[in-house]
UniProtKB/Swiss-Prot annotation:
This is Mitochondrial import receptor subunit TOM40B. It comes from Homo sapiens (Human). GO terms for cellular component: mitochondrial outer membrane translocase complex; mitochondrion; pore complex; protein-containing complex. The lineage of its organism: Eukaryota, Metazoa, Chordata, Craniata, Vertebrata. Potential channel-forming protein implicated in import of protein precursors into mitochondria. Residues 281-308 are annotated as: Required for mitochondrial targeting. The gene is TOMM40L. Its main location: mitochondrion.
Length: 308
């Protein structure tokens, strides 16, 4: 008897399982579209500042700040923060209560709450001594691939005035995010609305963002050259003020020296830089900054010490 070979019919060949596509990510908040680029630029410093941070527990910490400047009177700020037990990410903890009060009694306070798994709420209050300046309420819903936000600013039912801001962001692909912003304001004898469209494209080493509306345009480009060098380019145009600004920022990290350098140059002939130096094993950070505006012939320099 000869050997019998069984051949499977062509139609019964094993099929490959269909490739499952990864779900689109959440685009984040509208206010964070330009954050990567803005973090490259240095914060302006002037005068001498001493900051002492103290962690009282795993949930509560305080900070004392003393600022002396040639442009104004010396000031003192007390900063307190409370963080709850619900941590969604390394930078998001709920509930969170943050407050800052200066020596004149003015208060800035912010409360963050997680009402549901996808629903967040925020309340912001600002006072000047005994007078309320700002009260703002935000509601944000984060879906699988979109974010919707509604903000009410200074609502006054008696005076019939309010500022409403609506944001929406949608992830179209893993790299492309599109959305918009609608700002509506109303007060006696006046009301209006401004629509702004936004887009963000994220590559492996760079991010480009653009906001365009009737009020102007805001474009930014962030590029991470390597683990130490980051650059940012920002363009802002305001149609109401008829003003246009172009800025270039530079961020350099030197881990072996425990130093961080930030610099900027803009189209208003302003040049500035801030150098931060950590002093291990002491919990001390030194910062030295200088800013020169050639057009207005103004020079500002500052020095700060942060403990804790």
């Amino acid at each position: 008897m000869g050997n019998t070979l069984g051949l499977a019919p062509m139609g019964t060949l094993p099929r490959r399982s269909p490739r499952r596509e990864e779900p689109l990510p959440n685009p984040g908040s509208f206010d964070e579209l330009h954050r990567l680029c803005k973090d490259v630029f240095p914060a302006q410093m002037e005068g001498v500042k001493l900051v002492v941070n103290k962690v009282l527990s795993s949930h509560f910490q305080v900070a004392h700040t003393i600022h002396m400047s040639a442009l104004g009177l010396p000031g003192y700020h007390l900063h307190a923060a409370y963080a709850g037990d619900w941590q969604l990410s390394p930078t998001e903890v709920f509930p969170t209560v943050v407050g800052d009060m200066d020596s004149s009694g003015s208060l800035n306070a912010q409360v963050l709450l997680l009402l549901a798994e996808r629903l967040r709420a925020k309340a912001v209050f600002q006072t000047q001594q005994a007078k309320f300046l700002t009260w703002q309420f935000d509601g944000e819903y984060r879906g699988d691939d979109y974010t919707a936000t509604l903000t009410l600013g200074n609502p006054d039912l008696i005076g019939e005035s309010v500022i409403m801001v609506a944001h929406f962001l949608q992830s179209l692909t893993h790299r492309l995010v599109l959305g918009g912003e609608l700002v509506y304001h109303r007060r006696p004898g006046e009301e209006g609305a401004i629509l702004t469209l936004a887009g963000k494209y994220s590559a492996v080493h760079w991010v480009a963002t653009l906001n365009v509306g009737s009020g102007g345009a805001h474009a930014s480009y962030y590029h991470r050259a390597n683990e130490q060098v980051q650059v940012g380019v920002e363009f802002e145009a305001n149609t109401r003020l008829q003003d246009t600004t172009f800025s270039f920022g530079y961020h350099l990290t030197l881990p072996q020296a425990n130093m961080v350098f930030r610099g900027l140059v803009d189209s208003n002939w302003c040049v500035g830089a801030v150098l931060e130096k950590k002093m291990p094993p002491l919990p001390v950070t030194l910062a030295l900054g200088a800013f020169l505006n050639h057009w207005r012939n103004r020079f500002h320099c500052g020095f700060s010490i942060t403990v804790g």
